[in-house]
């Protein structure tokens, strides 16, 4: 009987892996596996970074060790040489990002709601969204000078397009089934727009918002290199020109940490705004 059973299992089309009971994962590890793997990956990166410099593969004139970078970062925050440069950059990035967020969502929703506007905006969109920001720096300087206005304008430009594109795509992609159901129940245009279109579109708009937040600091560093007396971009460039390698990488570290904090904040906001979707999709 056992032989017959074994033969039937071998002749079955069911893969052997599906016949074996899956291994039960540790509940704690299942919950924190991303954190665990993230810490391991970061540790391996730091070890590799230290080894590259310590073994002489790369001169410390070009790449400081992790410990020297962290020391320069802490010292810069303690004596104010680095801390005083972070806040002006954060202010510019936040102002530019908020302006781009308002314009991008408002115009994106408008264009996405009217099909004729989509057709009119498509060639303009294809042209401007692919222009290099560095190529446009002289244009911004020409119009706004080298003061705060040009830096904020550059950030607005870099942040606007991801938000606008995602907003247009999200609004125009709202399922007709939802719209027809709302109309069948007697909902008016304003109600459909505020209670159906916008909630359905927001989950698809948020990836553009997060990309825009990343673009804000990338564009800001380029803008600060054009001119100005303070800012994280100025700090990094000045340290580079003076061959202060640990200070240069400390500035880069500060920029990365600010980006992580901003991304974490946006993740929490997205989690709250799209909570209704998780209830429907069990995510």
Question: What is the meaning of each model-derived region?
Answer:
Residues 1-41, 264-283:
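Transmembrane alpha-helical segments of polytopic membrane transport and secretion proteins
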Residues 54, 109, 116-123, 166, ...:
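Membrane-spanning helices that line or support transport/gating and their immediate boundary helices
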Residues 95-125:
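Transmembrane-helix boundary motif in ABC transporter permease subunits
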Residues 115, 207, 249-283:
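C-terminal transmembrane helix and the adjacent membrane-cytosol boundary/short C-terminal tail
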């Amino acid at each position: 009987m056992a032989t017959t059973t074994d033969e039937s299992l071998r002749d079955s089309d069911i893969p052997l892996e599906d016949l074996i009971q899956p291994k039960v994962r540790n509940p704690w590890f299942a919950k924190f596996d991303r954190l665990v793997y993230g810490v391991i990956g970061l540790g391996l990166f730091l070890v590799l970074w230290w080894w590259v410099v310590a073994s002489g593969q790369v001169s410390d004139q070009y790449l400081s060790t992790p410990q020297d970078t962290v020391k320069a970062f802490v010292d810069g925050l303690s004596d104010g040489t680095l801390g005083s440069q972070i806040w002006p950059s954060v202010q510019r990035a936040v102002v530019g990002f908020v302006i781009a967020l308002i314009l991008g969502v408002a115009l994106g929703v408008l264009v996405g709601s009217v099909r004729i506007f989509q057709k009119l905006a498509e060639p303009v969109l294809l042209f401007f969204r692919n222009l290099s920001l560095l190529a446009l720096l002289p244009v911004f300087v020409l119009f706004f000078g080298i003061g705060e206005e040009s830096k904020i304008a550059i950030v607005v430009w870099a942040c606007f397009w991801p938000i606008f594109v995602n907003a247009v795509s999200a609004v125009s992609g709202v399922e007709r089934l939802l719209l027809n159901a709302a109309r069948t129940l007697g909902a008016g245009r304003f109600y459909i727009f505020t209670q159906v279109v916008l909630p359905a579109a927001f989950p698809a708009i948020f990836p553009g918002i997060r990309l825009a937040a990343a673009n804000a600091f990338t564009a800001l560093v380029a803008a600060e290199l054009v001119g100005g007396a303070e800012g994280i971009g100025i700090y990094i460039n000045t340290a580079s020109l003076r061959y202060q390698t640990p200070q240069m990488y400390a500035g880069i570290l500060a920029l990365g940490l600010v980006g992580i904090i901003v991304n974490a904040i946006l993740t929490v906001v997205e989690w709250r705004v799209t909570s209704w979707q998780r209830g429907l999709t069990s995510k």
